[in-house]
């Protein structure tokens, strides 16, 4: 009997990607985050679609329309909070996914890694324009401050900012175009994710040891299907705990005040998942320097394959590099904390030291440590 799963042109693609895919037999739960990101994206697109049915992208009615969704639309409150907190879960999974890639040397798959970095930028852009839509105080001032950073670009900066704004300040035109961007970008993310997966399946997955696993492969279904389902159930559990018990835990109280261009909030800050980059931006007193540091803090990921000096791929058998990796994680958590603090002593100096340490670990200490480990093993 001909198996339709293996012969049908469309089903064959799905089969080779999710069913008969040969996978390493020893990949740990750190490899779950790819599928979790896929679930997050689907969840965000679905909840976002239902929100877009009731939302109006006009400065006069945007805030009221979000209130209307929460008060009057059937289960509108749960859809709204699933979307807002779903973004937080998305970024938690993203950071774990990137961290796994750094720890286990997955960045040696160049195409997959570079598409992944582009995906990270796209998701960050989507989250930023989405945060502007409720048109609260932090939405408005966040949009004003972050878009204003582009004015640091020499010669064309000011024109560029006014072009993005569609006027001389953040106003109706800005809100409308941000809604359009926020609607289209998730579909671009979905397309990029397919390309990401395409490149990954050209090489096959990495594994915790970093050693080629061609000699020991198992089919994706049922082993990793079950493992992924467990991860998905845990993700939904954490998301629903957040949505049903503490929906505003990760939000900003200022965003419950309608946008007012005449009243600046005492402390402008983005959502928690951007705070580490925001802290790096603020730690440099010069505007252009801050913007360059901000972009570099993410763009530095593209350099990871070039900075890999170890003879081993993974950090699994490299204790010194492991210590350095966890210091980097602690440094990023420190930056996240600093990003949410006011600009005053001692937070300024802590932020500057943490920012210097971030770049120093990645650009200097990691390559040196890897070389030392090579020499200790007489390689």
From Swiss-Prot:
Its main location: mitochondrion. One of its GO terms (molecular function) is metal ion binding. Keywords: Electron transport, Heme, Iron, Membrane, Metal-binding, Mitochondrion, Mitochondrion inner membrane, Respiratory chain, Transmembrane, Transmembrane helix, Transport, Ubiquinone. One of its GO terms (biological process) is mitochondrial electron transport, ubiquinol to cytochrome c. It is a multi-pass membrane protein. Heme b b566 binds at residues 97, 196. Heme 1 (or BL or b562) is low-potential and absorbs at about 562 nm, and heme 2 (or BH or b566) is high-potential and absorbs at about 566 nm. The cytochrome bc1 complex contains 11 subunits: 3 respiratory subunits (MT-CYB, CYC1 and UQCRFS1), 2 core proteins (UQCRC1 and UQCRC2) and 6 low-molecular weight proteins (UQCRH/QCR6, UQCRB/QCR7, UQCRQ/QCR8, UQCR10/QCR9, UQCR11/QCR10 and a cleavage product of UQCRFS1). This cytochrome bc1 complex then forms a dimer. This is Cytochrome b. The lineage of its organism: Eukaryota, Metazoa, Chordata, Craniata, Vertebrata.
